[in-house]
């Protein structure tokens, strides 16, 4: 079975405590990391969990309360200092791009990688990410702000069947049977 597990980096409310960090989870699907929310302190928790920063390429933000997104700028900046070159994809309400772009322009100018925004409407159920391993769908939720959950659907791995080997063993089977 392929790897599919979740790391809870934080599950606290809007006020982190000494025992609970702000909201952030990382889903590991076949060694690709997907972050769901990025509360303050998420990058420290990533290090504690011994998760490789280089495998994190997609961040999904459920809504625009600070405890779900205040860790983004620090993480983006750290990736720049680590000389990351792979693009970082942020999937969130369109307003997040409007909020982050001035900060990126001021603090992160000249980074060796791009931050790519993928805005979505949290009030609509839609597929917002799809590759050969997984698809991600938004699920609208009730909250004080437009909010959604994320449904990660793992896709089956293709069978590793070689036609030439099937033909070879079938011909052997025919010879043995005669």
Model-inferred region functions:
Residues 40-91, 119-121:
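Active-site metal-binding motif and surrounding structural segment of the metallo-beta-lactamase
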Residues 121-178:
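Metal-dependent phosphodiesterase/nuclease catalytic metal-binding core
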Residues 6, 115-117, 136:
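Generic structural signal for residues in well-ordered beta-strands
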Residues 51-54, 113, 132-134:
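Structured loop/turn residues at beta-strand edges in well-structured enzyme cores
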Residues 51-52, 80-84, 108-109, 129, ...:
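Short, charge-rich binding segments
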Residues 84-88, 93-121:
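Active-site neighborhood of divalent metal-dependent phosphoester bond hydrolases
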Residues 1-49, 87, 150-152, 159:
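Conserved beta-strand hairpin/beta-sheet module of binuclear metal-dependent hydrolase folds
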Residues 43, 53, 66, 97, ...:
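Alpha-helix N-cap/helix-start and coil->helix boundary motif
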């Amino acid at each position: 079975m392929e790897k599919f597990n979740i790391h809870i980096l934080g599950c606290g409310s809007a006020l982190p405590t000494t025992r609970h960090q702000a909201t952030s989870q990382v889903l590991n699907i076949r060694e690709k990391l997907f972050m769901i929310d990025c509360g303050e302190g998420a990058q420290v928790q990533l290090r504690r969990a011994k998760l490789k920063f280089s495998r994190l390429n997609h961040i999904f933000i459920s809504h625009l309360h600070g405890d779900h997104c205040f860790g983004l700028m620090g993480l983006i900046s750290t990736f720049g200092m680590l000389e990351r070159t792979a693009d970082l994809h942020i999937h969130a309400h369109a307003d997040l791009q409007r909020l982050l772009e001035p900060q990126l322009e001021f603090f992160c100018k000249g980074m060796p990688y791009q931050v790519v925004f993928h805005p979505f409407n949290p009030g609509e159920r839609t597929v917002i990410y799809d590759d050969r391993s997984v698809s991600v769908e938004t699920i609208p939720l009730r909250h004080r702000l437009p909010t959604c959950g994320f449904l990660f659907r793992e896709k089956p791995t293709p069978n590793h069947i070689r036609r030439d080997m099937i033909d070879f063993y079938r011909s052997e089977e025919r010879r043995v049977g005669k």
